[in-house]
């Protein structure tokens, strides 16, 4: 997608009033497929909103603008005490290992990023009263039968807890459970986004 077309599409389809202003925003997985676009939208297209964007990713990232701070970190090697000690207004958790090749190779890191790190970020968000967004996956539905395609949002899923894919599917489900608990039991302003495939 060409840069100018992308910017035009965003400006035509996203209302400016839904983008926050003068906020500190943490994005994990900031150089992933979704993360880099989100950073670009917030830091460049809506740079007049004067948000300060912090991006954490293991991979090298380009500094899009002066209001973007890139932190090169491997989140699988960190505990919450090593996360930025900044009071963020928004925490958007995108970091993960979505590729079957890699999550089969690194199942425990996959579980950590999807579930355990999610909980640590929710604890930080609860303490600072941040808004928290958890990026889940359509994989939480598993393999729905024909009668459940197209799949309804309230479909409980057909997922095996044992198998090569289970480390990803089940940890995403647990991440959603943590989000539900923190929202309903601890009044965390939390949301779940459950994307299907992106192109």
Q: Model-predicted segments: where are they?
A:
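Non-catalytic terminal and boundary segments that flank Rossmann-like NAD(P)-dependent oxidoreductase
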Residues: 1-25
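N-terminal Rossmann NAD(P)H-binding glycine-rich loop of SDR-like oxidoreductase domains
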Residues: 24-44
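Rossmann-fold cofactor-recognition segment
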Residues: 66-78
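NAD(P)H-binding glycine-rich loop region in Rossmannoid oxidoreductase-like domains
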Residues: 79-113
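Glycine-rich NAD(P)-binding loop of the Rossmann-fold in SDR/ketoreductase-type enzymes
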Residues: 90, 106-120, 162, 166, ...
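Conserved Rossmann-fold NAD(P)-dependent oxidoreductase catalytic core, especially the SDR/UDP-sugar
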Residues: 119-165
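Flexible, glycine-rich beta-alpha linker
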Residues: 140-143, 166-167, 188-199
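Active-site Tyr-X1-5-Lys
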Residues: 162-191
């Amino acid at each position: 997608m060409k840069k100018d077309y992308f910017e035009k599409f965003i400006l035509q389809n996203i209302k400016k009033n839904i983008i926050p202003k003068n906020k500190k925003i943490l994005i994990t997985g900031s150089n992933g497929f979704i993360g880099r676009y989100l950073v670009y939208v917030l830091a460049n297209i809506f740079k007049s909103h004067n948000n300060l964007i912090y991006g954490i990713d293991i991979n090298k990232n380009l500094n899009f603008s002066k209001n973007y701070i890139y932190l090169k970190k491997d989140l699988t090697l960190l505990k919450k005490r090593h996360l930025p000690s900044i009071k963020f207004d928004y925490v958007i958790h995108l970091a993960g290992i979505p590729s079957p090749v890699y999550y089969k190779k690194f199942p425990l890191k996959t579980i950590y990023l999807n579930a355990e790190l999610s909980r640590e970020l929710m604890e930080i968000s609860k303490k600072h009263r941040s808004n928290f967004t958890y990026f889940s996956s359509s994989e939480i539905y598993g393999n729905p039968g024909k009668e459940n395609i197209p799949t309804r949002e309230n479909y409980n899923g057909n997922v095996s807890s044992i198998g090569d894919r289970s480390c990803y599917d089940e940890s995403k489900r647990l991440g959603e459970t943590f989000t539900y608990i923190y929202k309903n039991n601890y009044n965390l302003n939390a949301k779940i986004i459950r994307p299907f495939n992106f192109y």
